[in-house]
């Protein structure tokens, strides 16, 4: 089971070739993909997103947010920032969701490496 970050989803939806988009395609065919709620929010924020794509994205099972999630996400972000590493709020929410659910995160965004070092995020960083 995997979750994909927004960067991988956008590349996939635009038909961009890459290790990550191929892995996402295979995982979708095998029904081995779950959706991070923050990623879904980012994807649905695109005013140009076709309605049929929105409907398809909404059919992917979402990872459940667990109690005290917001506190853990805030502490995770603070931990990364204390090391003077980049930790965008959305990335912290995505990382914490995957950490809590023990789900591998597939991405092409190298900023997630900071969460691997700080919190043992299970990351599959693909070459675009």
Region annotations inferred by a language model:
Residues 50-54, 80-81, 122-125:
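Short, hinge-like loop/turn segments at secondary-structure boundaries
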Residues 8, 39, 69, 93-94, ...:
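Alpha-helix capping/helix-boundary segments
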Residues 1, 95, 99-128:
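Acidic, PIN/NYN-like endoribonuclease modules and their adjacent C-terminal/linker elements
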Residues 4-7, 35-36, 86-88, 109, ...:
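Histidine- and aromatic-rich ligand-binding microenvironments
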């Amino acid at each position: 089971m995997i979750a994909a970050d927004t960067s991988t989803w956008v590349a996939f939806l635009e038909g961009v070739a890459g290790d990550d988009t191929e892995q996402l395609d295979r995982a979708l065919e095998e029904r081995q993909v779950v959706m991070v709620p923050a990623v879904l929010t980012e994807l649905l924020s695109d005013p140009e997103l076709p309605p049929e794509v929105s409907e398809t994205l909404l059919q992917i099972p979402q990872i459940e947010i667990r109690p005290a999630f917001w506190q853990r996400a805030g502490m995770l972000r603070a931990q990364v920032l204390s090391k003077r590493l980049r930790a965008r709020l959305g990335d912290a929410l995505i990382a914490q969701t995957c950490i809590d659910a023990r789900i591998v995160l597939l991405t092409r965004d190298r900023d997630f490496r900071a969460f691997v070092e700080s919190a043992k995020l299970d990351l599959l960083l693909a070459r675009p």
